[in-house]
């Protein structure tokens, strides 16, 4: 980094754990004061920092190296860390623009919480809750009352996360779309729907939601308990996340590797 005239800034608690005598910033303050973020961890670490970057409005790229398990988003391996960092600092690395989602929870016409997420917004019942009725609209058009354990509104980037696990489609991350996927629907014909990016999805619990166990979660990082007739509004965010790509693999190579396609 010295050769590139770059001053590294470490996250405060991480530097303390490693007993590093370096410049540090709190995690929430990092995006506003740096030109690039290097993440070492799994997809959860990336999602946590992606939300912070989006909330601050910082227009900075992220280089994510997989120190975790599966690592769909943190696709750069440890062996590729230094070559990838060199390309990023030289300005020759390839960047993806990953679309994000904006989620607003409204109660009695008042905003309870607003979040920006990269993967998905999930509405789900508690372990001891009955099956829910979720009234779903897209814009001004009513879609259906879904009887299900929950519902996922995912971005194309999030299509390979929880959405994929419950039978949703894989959507290329550069496609401009939203994905609406029911979780364990009572009716088998309630299938996932791919929507235009300009859509606003509105989800309202109307039955099975009066036991204080229904929650909406944002990228699995943060959750809010829902009441009956709360409305969860999900739409495409105005900004996107700049994510450095692995230097030696394209998106389909990542799918083959992570999903073990064509392996016996």
Can you annotate each of these PLM segments?
Residues 1-36, 40, 79-94, 105-115:
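ATP/NTP phosphate-donor binding region
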Residues 39, 47, 153:
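Redox-cofactor binding/interface segments in oxidoreductases and associated redox assembly factors
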Residues 39-43, 51-54:
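N-terminal glycine-rich "phosphate-gripper" loop used for MgATP/nucleotide binding
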Residues 44-50, 160-165:
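Short glycine/serine/threonine-rich phosphate/pyrophosphate-binding segments
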Residues 57-75:
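Short, acidic/small-residue loops that bind anionic groups at enzyme active sites
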Residues 69-149:
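Catalytic core of DAGKc-family lipid kinases
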Residues 123, 139-142, 190-264:
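ATP/nucleoside-binding phosphotransfer catalytic cores, i.e., glycine-rich phosphate-binding loops
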Residues 141-189:
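Gly/Ser/Thr-rich active-site loops/lids in small-molecule metabolic enzymes
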